[in-house]
Every structure is written in C-alpha cells, then in structure tokens.
C-alpha cells in the first residue's frame, strides 16, 4: 500500500481498489504480502504530508488513517521506526536520520503512538485480521470512501469504514451479520438486524473499525 496507494496520496482510487486485496493480485495467501507506509528507501509519510502544506494537527490524523489500513488489511504490516509517533525527519542519504524520541511525550506524538498501540492490540487479539477472509463490501468513489469486511470463519468479524476525503462523509455501512457490533475507537455499540445497514458519519481522513461482540 506504499506509494500510489498511500493514505496521504489517494489520487487513483480505482487502482487502489484493485490492489487492496492481495488474493486478486495473484498471491496464494495474504501472508505472502508485506504492507507498509514507510521504509528507509523513501521519504517519510509525515514529511511528505507536511511538505504538501498540511500542519501537524492535520497530518497526524492522516498517519492514523494509514495505520488503520495497515493493521486491518490482508497481509503482514511492517513499521519503520518512528512512524508510530509521526517522525518527520527528512530522508538523508548516507547520513544519520535522527529520531526525535521526545515527541512521544508531546500531545500529537502521544496520541498517534496510542492509536498505533490500539491497532497492534486489535490485530493481535483478532485472528480475522491475520487470516484470509476479506471482502470489499462497498466503495463510494465520489466520496473517496470504502468499506471492507474481515472474518476468519470462527465468528470473529470486523467491518472497516474508511474515509480518505478531506471532508466528513455520511456512508451506508452494510453489516454482514446480525448481532452487536462495537466501534473500536469511541466505544459506540450497535444492535444490527440480519444484513442490516447503518448510516455512519465519518470524520475527514479517518476510519471507523467495528468488531462483532
């Protein structure tokens, strides 16, 4: 998902819909794919966002959106040291690239680090995020938004609603099964009827992750 499908540069929406599922790219198993937002070979995502004219207050939510995809998409997530708090040191070739560890204590760095911790815990707890079960259940090109479903066949299910747009969006979220669903980040709970739809308000450049209770 790095490069043209990075959360901060979601310009080719149709192309990104094609590559979001590794099984449709010819891979036999999701575990054969390594997803990443940053690596030592490219400029850091936060640096690119800041250089595009965003301030840190708007840049970190974009990084958090990328993290939500990274930990909930099929494939294995890879982190580049520092991205979990929004390190923005410019890439220097053949020189030491400084890490600003003190930023983990700043409000913005602490918030982003906690979001990464939440997502890492979520992936560790839910086998559905580490397995093969994946379906793209809705896409809204005009709103630059999509919704996908993860499952593992044991009853563990998650629904991820993603808004890549810089504006808030109201989306119809199709839940695949009835029961109680809880949103990971704000604790909202929903009682869903059989294949019930729910209308969700999603903030700009953000994701909502629902877990079946």
Functional labels for PLM-detected ranges:
Residues 16, 21, 100-139, 206:
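Aromatic- and carboxylate-lined catalytic core of secreted/periplasmic carbohydrate-active enzymes
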Residues 31, 61-64, 68, 110-117, ...:
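A structural signal for well-ordered alpha-helical segments within the folded catalytic domains
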């Amino acid at each position: 998902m790095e490069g043209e499908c990075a959360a901060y540069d979601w310009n080719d929406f149709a192309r990104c819909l094609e590559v979001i599922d590794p099984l449709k790219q010819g891979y036999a198993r999701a575990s054969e794919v390594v997803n990443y937002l940053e690596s030592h070979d490219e400029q850091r995502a936060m640096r690119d966002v800041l250089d595009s004219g965003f301030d840190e207050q708007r840049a970190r939510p974009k990084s958090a959106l990328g993290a939500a995809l990274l930990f909930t998409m099929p494939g294995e997530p890879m982190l580049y040291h520092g991205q979990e708090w929004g390190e923005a040191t410019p890439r220097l070739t053949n020189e030491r690239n400084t890490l600003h560890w003190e930023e983990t204590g700043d409000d913005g760095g602490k918030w982003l680090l906690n979001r990464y911790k939440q997502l890492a815990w979520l992936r560790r707890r839910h086998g559905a995020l580490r397995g093969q079960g994946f379906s793209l259940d809705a896409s809204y090109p005009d709103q630059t938004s999509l919704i996908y479903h993860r499952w593992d066949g044991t009853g563990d299910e998650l629904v991820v609603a993603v808004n890549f747009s810089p504006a808030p969006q109201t989306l119809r979220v199709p839940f695949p099964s009835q029961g109680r669903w809880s949103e990971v980040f704000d604790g909202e709970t929903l009682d869903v009827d059989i294949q019930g739809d729910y209308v969700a308000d999603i903030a700009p450049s953000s994701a909502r992750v629902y877990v079946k209770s």
